[in-house]
Amino acid sequence: MWYSKCSWTLVVLVALFALVTGSCLEYGHSCWGAHGKRSGGKAVIDAKQHPLPNSYGLDSVVEQLYNNNNNNQNNQDDDNNDDDSNRNTNANSANNIPLAAPAIISRRESEDRRIGGLKWAQLMRQHRYQLRQLQDQQQQGRGRGGQGQYDAAAESWRKLQQALQAQIDADNENYSGYELTK
């Protein structure tokens, strides 16, 4: 009897574990997004999407301060004046500290990328709008039998007809003038 209860419990536990494996419940989240009830906390989502800035800037500044401190101690061990050691420390710190920490640069780059992305999105919207207008104009032109579109051959034929008609009219004027004097 106890064997059947134990085996049934094990089957249920294995089945539950199989259902949980690979889902968000495996990681301790309580998201029911697929069912539309609730999703994970906003702080958790933001932490996943926006990782902390790179600590390279902080590490490099700490390393430079450590090296400057060692240089300062070496200068004091050489029995130099305090003025000389201060000048060395100041010169070293001015040359070694970066102008902007990489963490700040990465924030600026991400903002620039975001702004650049918005600019590209706006340009693409304008391009799609202009393309849609052009396609609409072309479709309207085809629907009316080609009217509304520029046709170079038809335009040159029209100009040729006008030039020939002007020539015929000019010849008629000149010819009719001679006949009147008769």
From Swiss-Prot:
Main location: secreted
Glycosylation sites recorded in the entry for this protein: 174
Induction: In the brain, rhythmic expression is regulated by the circadian clock. In midgut enteroendocrine cells, induced by a high protein diet.
Subcellular location: Secreted
GO cellular component: extracellular space
GO biological process assignments: neuropeptide signaling pathway
Top-rank lineage group of the source organism: Eukaryota
Signal peptide: 1-22
UniProt keyword terms in alphabetical order: Amidation, Disulfide bond, Glycoprotein, Hormone, Neuropeptide, Secreted, Signal
Disulphide-bonded residues: 24-31
Propeptide, residue positions: 39-182
Disruption phenotype: No effect on developmental timing or on levels of the insulin-like peptides Ilp2 and Ilp3. Reduced and delayed behavioral activity, particularly in the morning, with significantly longer siesta. This phenotype is not further exacerbated in a PDF(01) background. No significant effect on free-running period or activity rhythm and power in the absence of a light-dark photostimulation cycle, but enhances the reduction in free-running activity power and rhythmicity of PDF(01) mutants. No effect on photic entrainment of circadian rhythms.
Modified sites of kind Histidine amide: 35
Family annotation (InterPro entries): CCHa1/2
Biased amino acid composition, Low complexity: 87-103
Tissue-by-tissue expression: Expressed in endocrine cells of the larval midgut (at protein level). In the brain, expressed in the optic lobes, lateral protocerebrum, subesophageal ganglion, and intermediate and superior medial protocerebrum (at protein level). Expressed in DN1a neurons but not in other clock neurons and expression follows a rhythmic pattern controlled by the circadian clock (at protein level). In the posterior midgut, expressed in enteroendocrine cells (at protein level). Low levels in larval brain with higher levels in larval and adult gut and adult brain.
Annotated region (Disordered), positions in chain: 67-103, 133-154
Keyword field contains Membrane: no
Listed GO MF terms: neuropeptide hormone activity
Function in brief: Neuropeptide ligand for the CCHamide-1 receptor CCHa1-R. Neuromessenger mediating signaling between neuronal cells of the circadian clock network involved in regulation of sleep latency (the time required to fall asleep), amount of sleep and depth of sleep (arousability). Together with PDF, involved in regulating intensity and periodicity of daytime activity. In subsets of clock neurons modulates the rhythmic expression of PDP1 and PDF, and together with PDF modulates the rhythmic expression of circadian protein PER/period, but not TIM/timeless.
Name assigned to this protein: Neuropeptide CCHamide-1
Source species: Drosophila melanogaster
Organismal lineage: Eukaryota, Metazoa, Ecdysozoa, Arthropoda, Hexapoda
